[in-house]
Regions:
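Solvent-exposed loop/turn segments at secondary-structure junctions
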Residues: 33-35, 50-51, 77, 97-101, ...
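Substrate-binding/access-modulating region of protease and related hydrolase catalytic domains
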Residues: 96-179, 202-205, 225-236, 240-242, ...
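N-terminal domain-start motif of subtilase-like serine proteases
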Residues: 1-28, 51-59, 191-199, 288-290
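C-terminal subdomain of the subtilisin-like protease fold in secreted/lumenal serine endopeptidases
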Residues: 5, 124-128, 254-314
Length: 314
């Protein structure tokens, strides 16, 4: 995480001196679940199992715990070396994927509906969706999935989704990352350009919105400490890039608690550094946390209608 943070300009006056750590910001993570990893203990504020209906938190795959660690791990098990983006943010975990990392769209929709139900009570601000499925022609389930994800955005939540690992062909961004409304994250770096989903979408929407390093990102191991001596393990994919942006959004919402999701999205666009590749691969460019946190002037020129896994490990 240290190398990743350097690349995205994480270290700045806000994160180092002003104690901007995501404190008080609740982030819903729709994934394979979560465990009581030492880096997350005490900050898991909600739980729902839409797969098996269990009341006690668990993760039988590891993907969800890894994603949560990138977003909000405090690095306790590694003396801060592997701390996440927003180390004092809180996690509202919703299990929507099974032991194999797959699942049913209806379980994901049920998870979304639960987040909407608990949004005000739990003060949820951000929803991280590091999952996706390729579009299928005239598939009503795809349309329903997209409809409910956009309901999250319309409810005022910052929704961050993965571009998927089905690239690099054009039009390979997965659902729900192909939504005009959500913030869609692709993977940067040489390996990332070989698998990260590329736009434009079938509706000629410019996607992804931005790109972030997603290769061999070290984060929380769901088997630690009971079944493994290793507190952290690496994973690769747009799934890992997505919580980096969710964590950055948590920092911004701590600093500017009244900011709406649309304003945050536009500020994110305008703070990006131009990427090395064309727009269909990196959108508005690469995440620049320091500029994202500056947010000094209200952005009026939004250009929202610009046209032109996730799915798990690669």
């Amino acid at each position: 995480m240290k190398d990743l943070k350097r690349k995205i300009h994480y270290w700045c006056s806000d994160t180092m001196r002003n104690k901007i750590t995501g404190k008080g910001v609740v982030c819903a993570v729709l994934d394979t679940g979560i465990t009581q990893h030492p880096d997350l203990i005490g900050r898991i504020v909600g739980w729902k199992d839409c797969v098996q209906g269990k009341k006690t938190i668990y993760d039988d795959n590891g993907h969800g715990t890894h994603v949560a660690g990138i977003l909000a791990g405090n690095g306790k098990s590694g003396r801060g070396l592997y701390s996440g983006m927003a180390p004092e943010a809180q996690i509202f975990a919703v299990k929507v994927l099974n032991q194999r990392g797959g699942g049913k769209i209806r379980d994901v929709i049920n998870g979304i509906r639960y987040v909407l139900l608990k949004q005000k009570e739990m003060k949820i601000r951000i929803v991280n969706i590091s999952i996706g499925t390729l579009p299928h022609k005239k598939n009503p389930e795809d349309e329903l999935f997209l409809f409910w994800v956009e309901r999250l955005w319309d409810a005022g939540l910052v929704v961050v989704t993965a571009a998927g690992n089905k690239g690099p062909k054009e039009g390979s961004v997965t659902i729900p990352g192909n939504s005009r409304k959500v913030i869609t994250v692709g993977a940067d770096e040489e390996l990332g350009k070989k698998y990260s989903g590329c736009g434009p979408t079938g509706d000629c929407i410019k996607k992804p919105d931005l790109a972030v390093p997603g290769n061999r990102i070290y984060s929380c191991n769901y088997l630690y400490p009971v079944r493994s001596p290793y507190a952290y393990i690496p994973k690769t994919g747009t799934s890992m890039a997505t919580p980096v942006v969710s964590g950055a959004a948590a920092l911004v919402l701590q600093k500017y608690p009244d900011m709406c999701n649309l304003e945050l999205k536009y500020r994110l666009w305008n703070s990006c550094e131009k990427g090395r590749y064309y727009d269909q691969r990196q959108g508005h460019g690469n995440l620049h946390v320091e500029k994202f946190l500056e947010c000094q002037e209200k952005i009026l020129d939004t250009n929202e209608n610009l046209l032109y896994d996730s799915t798990g490990d690669k």
